[in-house]
Amino acid sequence: MTTSTAAIVDEQLTAPVVGVDVGGTKIAAALVSADGGLLGPVAEAPTPAREGAQAVLDAIASSVTTLIDTGAPAARRVRLAPVAVGIGSAGVIDAGRGVVASATDTITGWPGTDIAGGVARRLLAAGVASQDLLVHVDNDVNAYAAGEAWIGAGAGAGSVLVVAVGTGVGGAVVLDGHVHHGAHFLAGEMGHMPSGTAGSEPCTCGRSGHLEAIAAGPQIARRYREATGAV
C-alpha cells in the first residue's frame, strides 16, 4: 500500500476512486469517476471527534467500506480491482506521507496521526482493498482547491485561491495546476492570522485573536446569538 504525491489529476488513472472528506463534524465519502463525476450518492457519518484519532480512522474506513458494500453498482465493482482512496482532512497535512503534521483540538489527538497508513491497514483487514491500494491524503481545503482548479470555478485559471468557512477557516493556493503546500504545509492557510476584530476571542488552537475565532461557522452563529438574543 502506498501514499501518493500526485498532482491534481493523475492522467493515467482510469478507474474510479473513493473520495473522502474528513471534517470536524462529519465524514463524507463518495465514488468518483476518473473525470470527476459522482458515481452514486454521498455517504455521510458523524465524525467521532472527541473519541480520539483511532476512532476517527475507524469511522473513515467504515465509511469507505459501507460505500463499497452498499453503494452504487459501480462502487461494488471497484472491489474487484485495486482502488485508490483520496482523503481530505482537517489539520495541517504532510501530503507526502499522509500524516497530520499539526492540528487544533477540533479532533482530539489528531496531530501525528498516520491517516494514510491507518486507513489502508483497516481497509485491507476488512477485505475491501488489496496491497496495491493507493491512498493519498491532503488538507481538506487543499483537496477542495484542487477540485475547483480542475473542473470547478477555477478551471482554466493559472492560479486559484480558495477560502473555506466551516467548523474552522481554511485556505489553499493552486499554482500552475499544482497545490502549493509551502515549506511547512501551511501555504494559503489564513484561519490563524491575527485579526484586530477578534480581540481576545479564544481560538480552537488555544490562542486568541485569530480570524477563525470570529469567522468560523460556529463562531458566526454564536456572535449572531449574542448580538440579537436569538436562541
Annotate each language-model stretch with its function.
Residues 21, 140, 166:
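Active-site glycine-centered loops adjacent to acidic/histidine catalytic or metal-binding residues
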Residues 40-77, 112-114:
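N-terminal phosphate-binding loop and adjacent alpha-helix
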Residues 21, 29, 45, 87, ...:
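Residue-level signal for inorganic ion chemistry
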Residues 5-14, 32-33, 41-43, 52-55, ...:
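Glycine/GP-enriched mid-protein hinge/lid loop-to-helix segment characteristic of carbohydrate kinases
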Residues 1-16, 35, 66, 72-80, ...:
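Short, low-complexity, intrinsically disordered N-terminal peptides in bacterial proteins
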Residues 13-32:
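N-terminal basic/disordered segments at the start of proteins
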Residues 48, 53, 57-58, 80-85, ...:
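Glycine-rich phosphate-binding loop and adjoining helix at the ATP-binding site
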Residues 25, 37-38, 99, 178:
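Residue-level signal for well-ordered, solvent-exposed loop/turn and beta-edge residues enriched
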